[in-house]
Structures are given as structure tokens and as C-alpha cells.
Amino acid sequence: MDQNNNTVSEFIMLGFTTDPVIQKVLFAVFLVVYTLTLMGNSSLIMLICNDSRLHTPMYFFIGNLSFLDLGLSSVYTPKILETCISEDKSISFAGCVAQFFFSAALDYTECYLLAAMAYDRYVAISKPLLYSQAMSLKLCVCFVVASYVGGFINSVIITKDTFALTFCNDNVIDDFFCDIPPLVKLACGKKKSFQSVLFFLLTSNVIIPIVFILATYLFIIATILRIRSTQGRLKAFSTCSSHLISVTLYYGSILYIYARPRSSYSLDRDKIVSTFYTVVFPMLNPLIYSLRNKDVKEALNKLLK
């Protein structure tokens, strides 16, 4: 990514609004959300590390998901807070590249990790007696490492191609972070090859994991339906309900933004949806995975005593 190939040295973030009063309100809201995100995910990681009852494959993946959410929130939110209270709305070209790269890498990694978690839930429900052997620590680590490797490799590709575009002196980003739709909107010249790369990455990082997760849940549902007792069915379903909620919220928002036809893009509407998967969902995930979780509640009570 050679900056000399572009005619801009910095970008201007429009953010959400130019109204100073609303900006202050948004600053307070995002600060509270970011604080809760840091506290919630850090606490969940600490509980998983310190309580031996949570040293299982499921919580190993949940802990890694919390770590990713900490990273994602920290990539986005500090710059959002700065944009809300500072008159200087600029971000350097290098800063935009860095934010874009790490946000894409962590997002892609989370896509793969959620797919790995779906497989973990399938094994837990379909082979409960062999769960510990089937989901060994070595296999879990391999899944996590593969998720990171895949996420960062794909991020290198999309970052390189995005910032190889020519921006033609237009450097105003109508968004609160460096994202694909507003950057492509700024670019001029040939975009056809870029759209091909974007389609490939959308397929490999989002569509394929979604298809895998859907197939996995079909097998999970088939397994649950074979359970004779109602209590057994409810218990089996409860083990994957949190993951299903997380997958639906996360992938739903990503598909809404990136899988729609370009003619239907609305940056104002997309800002709201983007806020959820970049800022709100990292705060909600610890709640989703712990509110109805007996083991996490017991570990928390033990820690607080």
C-alpha cells in the first residue's frame, strides 16, 4: 500500500452528527458502553481462567471470543470518542489503514471462531460422552489459531486492495470509522477488480462460515429431536441458544451492510447498523453467554465471596 499512489494524506470523519449537544450525549453513551465492554469481557476472561469448572472447550472458545471483542471495541471506540468531543475530525492515512486492517482482521477471525464454536456445540450435543476426548485442547487451540491466521491473511488482502484505490482528492468519510462502503464511495477509477476481491472475501469469510453454521445447526436440531424427554431437549437446546443468538446478531448485521446491492446502500442507515456490530455487540456478548449460564454465575459468586 503505497501512499504515493493516492492523492490524500488524511481523511476527515463526519461521524454521526455535527450538532455539538448530540455529540456530547453520544460521547457519554459510547463511554459507558466501552467501559461496560471492557469490564464485562475482562471479567468473563478472568472467571474462565481462574475457575477450574470453566476449563472446558466451550468456555475456551467463549474466552477467546471475549478477547476478540475487547480488541474490536478498542479498535473502534477510542476514535469514536475522540471524534465526538474534538474539533479535529481527521485521521491520518496510516491511521486509517491501521484501523481498517485490525478491524477487518478481528472481524474475519470472529467469523471463523463462531463457526468453530458451532462445531463445538454439535459435538457436545451429539456425542456428550466423548465430548472431552473429541474436543481436545490441542484441537481447540488449532481452531483458534486457524481462525486468527485466516482472519489476518484475508485482512492483508482486503486492506491492500482497498488502499490501492485512488481517492481523487476527496477525503471526507461519511462514517465513524474507516470502512469499505464509504472508502469505495470516495474512490475513483477502476473498481471492478476490487469488487471481485470483495465478493471473494465476503464468500470465504462470511457466506461459507454461515453455511457451515446452518448445516451444523441442522444436525444439532436433528439430534435434539431424537431426545425423548422434554427436559432433555430443553437442556440440549440451552447449551447452544446463546451461541445462536450471538451468530444471528453478528452475521445479520454484517450481511445487511456488505451483502446488499450497491444501489441500496444508505450510509446514514448503515452507520446505525455498524454501531451495533462494532460497539454494542462486544458489550452484549458477555451478557448473552453468562446471564442464563449456571456455571458462570456460580464462578462469579465464588469470586465475590
Curated annotation (Swiss-Prot):
Membrane topology: Multi-pass membrane protein
Keyword annotations of the record: Cell membrane, Disulfide bond, G-protein coupled receptor, Membrane, Olfaction, Receptor, Sensory transduction, Transducer, Transmembrane, Transmembrane helix
Gene Ontology biological process terms in this record: G protein-coupled receptor signaling pathway; sensory perception of smell
Disulfide bonds: 96-178
Cytoplasmic face residues: 46-55, 118-138, 226-236, 292-305
Keyword Membrane: yes
Family matches, as InterPro entries: GPCR_Rhodpsn (IPR000276), GPCR_Rhodpsn_7TM (IPR017452), Olfact_rcpt (IPR000725)
Chief localization: membrane
Record's keyword annotation contains Transmembrane helix: yes
Pfam families per UniProt: 7tm_4
GO cellular component: membrane; plasma membrane
Stated name of the protein: Olfactory receptor 9G19
Protein source organism: Mus musculus (Mouse)
Organism taxonomic ancestry: Eukaryota, Metazoa, Chordata, Craniata, Vertebrata
